[in-house]
């Protein structure tokens, strides 16, 4: 999985960015999304507030904003078209590869790590996996959805080695 890391704050270490990249690649393998692409942007509370308002209509900062990429209209080609035109087939693979982007507030990550009594690394990993699952269709609007998403999220974090301790 290709993951573009963007640090708008200048405060996220290369080591942390690498850990988030590895964690998201691990999560992608767990749910069968290895051949996808996404972006992760680290921001402050002011910027995440702007993004939250612009894309979700919610006028406050949050910890992570997940923007799932959904083409406005489905592009459908006949199988023969793709077999006859390798360039078109490659273009369609690339088009289908991009799944979305995350905006993670490092301010909220620090606050929540302290509030929940675990490390900043654990909170950053939690937010990255939580957002990643959202852009892959998981949600928590109903108790059933919440149990599935949070269970998978905890399974990924624990298997990767990011526990609450």
From Swiss-Prot:
GO cellular component, as recorded: cytoplasm
GO-annotated biological processes: rRNA processing
Cofactor(s), names only, from the UniProt record: Zn(2+)
Residues the entry annotates as binding Zn(2+): 130, 134, 140
GO molecular function, one term: RNA endonuclease activity
Cofactor binding note from Swiss-Prot or TrEMBL: Binds 1 zinc ion.
Alphabetical UniProt keywords: Cytoplasm, Endonuclease, Hydrolase, Metal-binding, Nuclease, Ribosome biogenesis, rRNA processing, Zinc
Cellular compartments annotated: Cytoplasm
EC number: 3.1.-.-
Family from the record: Belongs to the endoribonuclease YbeY family.
Function according to Swiss-Prot or TrEMBL: Single strand-specific metallo-endoribonuclease involved in late-stage 70S ribosome quality control and in maturation of the 3' terminus of the 16S rRNA.
Protein name per the record: Endoribonuclease YbeY
Gene coding for it: ybeY
């Amino acid at each position: 999985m290709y993951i573009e890391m963007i640090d708008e704050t200048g405060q996220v270490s290369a080591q942390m960015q690498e850990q988030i990249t590895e964690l998201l690649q691990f999560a992608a393998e767990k749910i069968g999304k290895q051949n996808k692409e996404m972006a992760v942007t680290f921001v402050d509370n002011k910027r995440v507030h702007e993004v939250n308002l612009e894309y979700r209509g919610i006028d406050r900062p949050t910890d992570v904003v997940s923007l799932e990429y959904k083409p406005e209209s489905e592009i459908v080609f006949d199988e023969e078209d793709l077999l006859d035109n390798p360039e078109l087939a490659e273009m369609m693979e690339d088009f289908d590869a991009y799944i979305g982007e995350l905006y993670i507030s490092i301010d909220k990550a620090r606050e929540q790590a302290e509030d929940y009594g675990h490390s900043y690394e654990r909170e950053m990993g939690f937010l990255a996996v939580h957002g990643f699952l959202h852009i892959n269709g998981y949600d928590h609007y109903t108790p059933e959805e919440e149990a599935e998403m949070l269970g998978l999220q905890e399974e990924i974090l624990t298997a990767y080695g990011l526990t609450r301790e």
